[in-house]
Amino acid sequence: MPAMPSSGPGDTSSSAAEREEDRKDGEEQEEPRGKEERQEPSTTARKVGRPGRKRKHPPVESGDTPKDPAVISKSPSMAQDSGASELLPNGDLEKRSEPQPEEGSPAGGQKGGAPAEGEGAAETLPEASRAVENGCCTPKEGRGAPAEAGKEQKETNIESMKMEGSRGRLRGGLGWESSLRQRPMPRLTFQAGDPYYISKRKRDEWLARWKREAEKKAKVIAGMNAVEENQGPGESQKVEEASPPAVQQPTDPASPTVATTPEPVGSDAGDKNATKAGDDEPEYEDGRGFGIGELVWGKLRGFSWWPGRIVSWWMTGRSRAAEGTRWVMWFGDGKFSVVCVEKLMPLSSFCSAFHQATYNKQPMYRKAIYEVLQVASSRAGKLFPVCHDSDESDTAKAVEVQNKPMIEWALGGFQPSGPKGLEPPEEEKNPYKEVYTDMWVEPEAAAYAPPPPAKKPRKSTAEKPKVKEIIDERTRERLVYEVRQKCRNIEDICISCGSLNVTLEHPLFVGGMCQNCKNCFLECAYQYDDDGYQSYCTICCGGREVLMCGNNNCCRCFCVECVDLLVGPGAAQAAIKEDPWNCYMCGHKGTYGLLRRREDWPSRLQMFFANNHDQEFDPPKVYPPVPAEKRKPIRVLSLFDGIATGLLVLKDLGIQVDRYIASEVCEDSITVGMVRHQGKIMYVGDVRSVTQKHIQEWGPFDLVIGGSPCNDLSIVNPARKGLYEGTGRLFFEFYRLLHDARPKEGDDRPFFWLFENVVAMGVSDKRDISRFLESNPVMIDAKEVSAAHRARYFWGNLPGMNRPLASTVNDKLELQECLEHGRIAKFSKVRTITTRSNSIKQGKDQHFPVFMNEKEDILWCTEMERVFGFPVHYTDVSNMSRLARQRLLGRSWSVPVIRHLFAPLKEYFACV
């Protein structure tokens, strides 16, 4: 899930040009917020010395990301980004060594990439070099450090070690004696997503302990004051000199930060930590505004302005923020960052900071906006209607509905109270009181639920949702290392993300898959970019830098991270140098390192989509075949009819059609249907104008078919509105008329229906459609019976919908079979043909698919008609242009697929 960045900006005194660049990054670059990007807010794409054939320009160029000639920059919507080479805070590349598990060692490159205490000092090294051992950064001895600085730091470390007690360690033998960086303490980190859950009991214990320590310290200070009054000035001075000052590690705003939760520690260490927490030194008193509890917008390089709340340093479990910086808790995922005040704006600047494009594209951003406006409306006393829903998908959609009036209120200036009403209440300004309770509630409640009432019944532990598993790229690296060492079975881990919550096997490669990655795979497996290649990695459904297969008939991509991790270090560079490079699905070998292709992957992939149902429905009613002498002509209601593919197939099968009622609004489609079927179609206009009375008048119907527009359902469209807005709502018109056309109770005549839509739709939309239709879909790809890729979901009760798709002798399976004389196909199959003209171009180099007269050429209209299975010149009416005819074909069904689905109807209706 896209996530918020948690690393602070690099320099509080950046130049005007840099700030302008940051502003442009937020407005123009719409990168999904992946996990590794939170570690590396300004990650540069890896460079390769040799210009490769896998060149692909990203759709949006970042101002701080140089072009990569051999790898491709991708930005997935819920994908995890894991950089193959990570950047240190000072911009130096980390050097990888073999990962070696080390219990409790902090991952320097974990989500948020926070340095442990004392790491801020590493910023003084201009050329720091570290070796990564299972995510643990180890400084090289004396590397790039001036001798004087090393000596001074050594003295400071000795002094600090005296004060730290149980926390201090003797440094020797491992290069720590000359290091500028203190040994970091083990930290319990958590990842982007729902805020870390802390029970009320544990929170109360921590608060009580902090209060006790504060009282102890007050008594000690009072006792010391009493002693000083009785002692002379000389003795008092000796007492002061006897205790060296405690070393406070400042938090460098340039250092990446990680959201951490204070760990319960031993009593000794706890006393010392609590003493630090009780420090009375005022916080954020530099006169630059943005006090504790204020709602703000924060800006990090490469990301849009994001809403957050100023919090005290003790909330983060880290050290104090340096002067001129603030600790910010980001709404949406509950992570923390240090941000300089120049990169902060009050929430009242909503009009200038809110970014509509990011809101449309990123669920995490929508969630963040919802949460901050909930807090703002609560402070301002502004009431909004609350939607209560049962499951997660309903809740998310209710949030969408509730967000609209709140955003309008914010864009209007938070009236009537204005910015004054957004100020934090007095109790929130005191960091040592029990505040921010909404941050510690259960993850689901913190994400979506409205503010709870003051008193509510105590929930049982059984009712509390589970905290999500803590995983990141370091987790996957560690588990893969254990697999290499024969300590773990690869089938027991999710090879996509590293989770141990495996629910099924990966359909293509040996290894497991978790539920979250399954949902991503369902959405992204058939999502293609403009170049015809998959939008995301075949293994993890993510990846920012991908390698594209050199086989013209393959459209798969593999990200650099998965290749280097599973195949072996350096495998990505070797693939870049190989030209052409056949991917791991096309190669002759079946095994590449730990990446082993399943021998039966085609059937597994089919079963993956056939059995991907998280809802169970009663099987559809089965109608026995009708005796031949009792069969009657079929009566059809076709909604969103297009160019009458249904009628064409029924005629091809020899089924007699008594009545064919079609709802269609496209004039060109209506013209084709009228001309090609000699006026046998009764067109009834817009589907929204058809009423139950019309259904009774035109019926009864034996078959209802349709496929609503996919524009607002397809995840390829970043501005999609979903199932409940825009053209997505037309599905409910199909559902309404299907309900009206069903036989009345007691009428046992055969009644069939079919609904079609894209595979690349959101999991929640697919689940909602299935819930309304009380049926799970079947996925059918036209590439099995035609010369084009065209994967679609089909819901319905037609007999044998799940049977294998088999081609006939008349099906044209190769592009060459569809071409006119003298034309040569450069590809055996073309990618999905859509309404866009550039969908005809193929491959990463955007080649035309046909070669004629020693030149490349596009597909002719007659050839496209053959690809779809239509008769030649089927759309050649009323002097339509080539582009207009392609639009009609791009919205149509594949004739061989519909023939496959309609064939069993011959057992129920009269045939010619």
UniProtKB/Swiss-Prot annotation:
One term of GO molecular function: protein-cysteine methyltransferase activity
SAM-dependent MTase C5-type domain sequence ranges: 634-912
UniProt effect for mutating R771Q: In TBRS; uncertain significance
Record annotation: effect of changing W330R: In HESJAS; no effect on protein expression; changed DNA methylation; results in aberrant expression of genes involved in developmental processes
GO biological process: autosome genomic imprinting; cellular response to amino acid stimulus; cellular response to bisphenol A; cellular response to ethanol; cellular response to hypoxia; DNA methylation-dependent constitutive heterochromatin formation; hepatocyte apoptotic process; methylation
Zinc finger (GATA-type): 493-523
Domain ADD: 482-614
Region (Interaction with the PRC2/EED-EZH2 complex), start-end ranges: 494-586
Modification sites for Phosphothreonine: T124, T261
Result after altering P904L: In TBRS; somatic mutation
Binding site for S-adenosyl-L-methionine: D641, G642, I643, A644, T645, E664, D686, V687, R688, R891, S892, W893
Modified sites of kind Omega-N-methylarginine: R171
Mutagenesis or variant effect for D333N: In HESJAS; changed DNA methylation; results in aberrant expression of genes involved in developmental processes
Record keywords: Chromatin regulator, Chromosome, Cytoplasm, Disease variant, DNA-binding, Dwarfism, Intellectual disability, Isopeptide bond, Metal-binding, Methylation, Methyltransferase, Nucleus, Phosphoprotein, Repressor, S-adenosyl-L-methionine, Transferase, Ubl conjugation, Zinc, Zinc-finger
Residues recorded as bearing Phosphoserine in the entry: S105, S243, S255, S267, S390, S393
Signal peptide: none
Protein name according to UniProt: DNA (cytosine-5)-methyltransferase 3A
